C-alpha cells in the first residue's frame, strides 16, 4: 500500500497540556537543590531539634508561591529527598532521609491545599510550614521506632523535640511568606508571568 492511501485527518487531536511547564519543573528542581544546599551550608549552632526547618520551610513556602500549583512542594520534597539520599545525607540511612524530605513537601502541600493555597499570607504560611516540618518529625520518630535506632531527639524528650519542630517550622513559614511578599513588591511575578 502506498503512503497516499492512508487518510489524513483535517482535525488533529489537541495536544494534551502538561500540568507543570518545563520552566516550572526547572524552578522546582532548583528549589529542591536549594533545600539540600541549605541543609549542608546553613547550620545554626543551636543544638536544638528541628532548627534547620527555619531554612527548609522558607524555601518550601517560596516554592509554593513561585509555582502556585498543587503538588509543587511535594515535587520539591521528592526531588530534594532523592538528591539528599544520593549524597548520603541524614543520620539514619537513605530511606529515612528520602521519606523525611518527601514528607516535608507532601505535608506542606496538604496544609496549603486545606488552607486555601495562599503562601504569601503570614498565618497560612506559618501553619502550612509548621505542619510540613512536623511531618518530618513524625517520619524520623516513626522510622526510629520501627528500626529500633537510637533517635537523638528522644533523649532530649519527645515534647521538647515536637516543640522545636513546630516553632522552627512556623518561623521558616513566616520567613518564606515575607520573602514572597518582597518578591511581589519587586515585580518578580510579573517578570515570571512573561517566562511561562
Regions found by a protein language model. Give the residues of each.
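N-terminal juxtamembrane cytosolic/stromal segments of multi-pass membrane proteins
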Residues: 1-20, 184-196
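Short helix-perturbing small/polar motifs within transmembrane alpha-helices
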Residues: 2-4, 15, 26-30, 99-141, ...
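Hydrophobic transmembrane alpha-helices
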Residues: 10-66, 71
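Residue-level signature of transmembrane alpha-helical entry/exit and packing/kink sites
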Residues: 20-31, 53-57, 73, 97, ...
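Aromatic-anchored segments of alpha-helical transmembrane domains
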Residues: 32-41, 79-87, 129-139
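Interfacial aromatic-anchored transmembrane helix boundaries in multi-pass membrane proteins
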Residues: 39-49, 80-110, 144-145
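Membrane-helix interface "capping/anchor" motifs
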Residues: 63-76, 114-122
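Membrane-embedded alpha-helical hairpins and interfacial helices in multi-pass inner-membrane proteins
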Residues: 117-196
Amino acid at each position: 500500500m502506498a503512503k497516499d492511501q492512508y487518510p489524513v485527518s483535517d482535525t488533529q487531536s489537541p495536544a494534551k497540556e502538561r500540568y507543570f511547564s518545563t520552566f516550572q519543573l526547572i524552578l522546582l528542581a532548583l528549589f529542591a537543590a536549594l533545600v539540600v544546599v541549605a541543609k549542608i551550608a546553613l547550620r545554626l549552632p543551636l543544638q536544638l531539634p528541628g532548627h534547620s526547618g527555619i531554612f527548609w520551610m522558607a524555601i518550601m513556602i517560596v516554592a509554593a508561591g513561585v509555582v502556585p500549583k498543587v503538588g509543587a512542594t511535594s515535587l520539591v520534597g521528592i526531588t530534594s529527598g532523592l538528591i539528599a539520599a544520593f549524597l548520603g545525607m541524614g543520620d539514619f540511612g537513605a530511606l529515612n532521609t528520602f521519606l523525611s524530605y518527601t514528607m516535608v513537601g507532601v505535608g506542606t502541600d496538604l496544609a496549603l491545599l486545606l488552607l486555601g493555597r495562599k503562601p504569601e499570607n503570614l498565618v497560612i504560611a506559618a501553619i502550612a510550614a509548621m505542619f510540613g516540618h512536623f511531618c518530618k518529625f513524625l517520619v524520623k520518630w516513626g522510622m526510629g521506632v520501627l528500626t529500633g535506632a537510637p533517635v537523638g531527639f528522644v533523649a532530649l524528650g519527645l515534647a521538647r523535640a515536637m516543640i522545636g519542630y513546630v516553632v522552627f517550622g512556623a518561623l521558616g513559614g513566616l520567613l518564606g511568606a515575607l520573602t514572597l511578599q518582597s518578591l511581589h513588591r519587586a515585580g518578580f511575578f510579573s517578570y515570571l508571568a512573561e517566562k511561562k
